[in-house]
Regions:
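N-terminal catalytic scaffold of extracellular/periplasmic and nuclease hydrolases
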Residues: 58-246
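Bacterial Sec-dependent N-terminal signal peptides
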Residues: 8-10, 14-15, 19-58
Length: 247
């Protein structure tokens, strides 16, 4: 099967049949509990990274990167203890991802604060660099850009997507495609979304589609066509519009 056919098959089978159906069901309230949602996908999913690469025996076909909001060792162990209690036993019932063959831990302080925030933490998770609280995709000098693993994947010919339960220009998802000295620069972050050129974005809209500093500037919705993107609102609209567009 050709690479293009593999990509088409993946988009159809995964995005349409699994992820997006679950994604929209959760926010419509059809999945009522966080626990129920986690069993099918992840607890409090904020971000997801998907990369499709040319396949060979030494290379992963898909890569998923999940970030749970504020989720650390205590939250994971607490959940496992809770699941154990539900089964009436002493000890834990392991979660799926804690059984993976490899695991590690990371420090959580930022470059300037003992307690990080979503922007600095997102930048560290995306790029491997600590930065100042509030900064996205730049070092603590607020000028030097750093690039995410998603950008590296895109540069190597992979297809990349970002999905979040918050707005697409929020700090954590933005850390994978944007460069901003302040996380509140939502319009500029939205422009970076287009300019980075990933293949798929999903979230709860833009926080600031219009540039408050320059009302004459094009709003972010109108830029979609210019950059070759199609905007879909809701699962049914996505199904209607996803047959032809590539982004």
């Amino acid at each position: 099967m050709k690479e293009s056919e593999n990509v088409s098959l993946f988009i159809t089978s995964f995005y349409e049949k699994k992820f997006l159906k679950l994604y929209f069901s959760y926010f419509r309230g059809k999945i009522n509990s966080t626990q129920g949602f986690m069993k099918k996908l992840s607890i409090t999913i904020l971000f997801f990274l998907l990369a499709f690469c040319q396949i060979n025996a030494q290379q992963a076909k898909y890569v998923f990167y999940f970030i749970g909001d504020g989720m650390g060792v205590n939250q994971v162990q607490g959940t496992e203890l809770y699941l154990g209690e539900l089964e009436g036993k002493i000890g834990i019932t392991p979660l799926q991802f804690t059984q993976f063959p490899y695991a590690t831990v990371a420090t959580t302080f930022s470059a300037t604060n003992g307690v990080t925030d979503s922007a600095a933490a997102g930048t560290a998770l995306a790029t491997g660099n600590k930065t100042k609280n509030g900064a996205i995709g730049v070092l603590k000098d607020l000028q030097t850009p750093v690039y995410s693993v998603a950008t590296w994947a895109k540069e190597r010919g992979c297809r990349v997507g970002v999905a979040t339960s918050v707005s697409v220009d929020h700090a954590t998802p933005a850390a994978f495609y944007a460069h901003a000295s302040g996380r509140g620069s939502y319009y500029e972050i939205g422009k970076d979304l287009y300019e980075t050129g990933f293949d798929f974005y999903a979230g709860s809209d833009f926080l600031q589609p219009q540039d408050k500093k320059n009302p004459q500037a094009a709003n972010l919705y109108s830029l979609a066509d210019q950059y070759g993107y199609t905007i879909a609102r809701g699962y049914k609209d996505y199904l209607r519009k996803s047959k032809k567009p590539t982004r």
